[in-house]
Design a protein with these regions (language model features):
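Non-heme di-metal
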Residues: 1-220
Length: 220
């Protein structure tokens, strides 16, 4: 539930993958991908009990970034997105093999015709690590400005798309990682300019780093 623990576990999991250290996961049982019940991905990732959750569009007004309060609201909203992005990356790692098998067995020639390659898992583990870095950058800026992640209400809108696509790998890849991420790329430069106009160079540096990483998420 703790985003800071999520970041730490993400770093550990990526290190384990790079070093070839097994830390759980499924296995083939004839033509079925089996995952122990304790390792099934949750229907909804847990959140801290004191999190203030509101409907999409009902969170604190962000303004145009001219005031520190407005910039805090913008950074907080972005940190919420990055926290969900960590969850989404790991969710597609966990669900991918079973969904790939389902596609193969469907007989649809446009679907994947072989087990997912190691590069699939490596790419999404790297994505999870990037999102963890992004959350950390944003959380640090919030702390620098006298706030913290969790100080403002957040919404769970991104996870709604995950629920809608959890039974279709191609839909998940298209909606989450092409549509939503691409929308972020469109908005990011405008957000960066708001912080630049306010003279917030440290946030500009953090947001620019995030933007450049997100470009690779869409292009690969």
């Amino acid at each position: 539930a703790s985003p800071l623990h999520k970041v730490a576990y993400t770093r550990y999991a990526k290190h384990a993958l790079d070093q070839g250290i097994p830390i759980g996961g499924g296995a083939w049982r004839e033509s079925e991908w089996y995952v122990p019940p304790t390792e099934e991905p949750p229907d909804r990732p847990p959140r801290l009990q004191d999190e203030q959750c509101v409907a999409p569009g009902q969170q604190s007004k962000r303004g145009r970034g001219g005031s520190e309060r407005s910039r805090i609201a913008l950074l907080h909203a972005l940190a919420n997105i990055e926290q969900w992005a960590i969850d989404l990356a790991w969710d597609i790692v966990a669900r991918g093999p079973r969904l790939s098998v389902r596609h193969m067995q469907s007989g649809d020639t446009e679907r994947p015709d072989m087990p997912l390659p190691r590069a699939y898992f490596a790419d999404f583990c790297q994505m999870a690590l990037d999102e963890a870095k992004h959350f950390t950058l944003l959380q640090q800026r919030l702390v620098d400005m006298g706030s913290f992640f969790g100080a403002l209400p957040v919404h769970h809108g991104l996870w709604d798309s995950a629920v809608e696509t959890r039974e279709d790998l191609c839909a998940r890849l298209s909606i989450i990682h092409l549509v939503h991420e691409a929308r972020g790329l469109d908005v990011n430069p405008l957000t960066i300019e708001k912080f630049r106009a306010a003279g917030d160079a440290r946030s500009v540096d953090s947001l620019t780093t995030i933007h450049l990483d997100e470009i690779t998420h869409v292009s690969t």
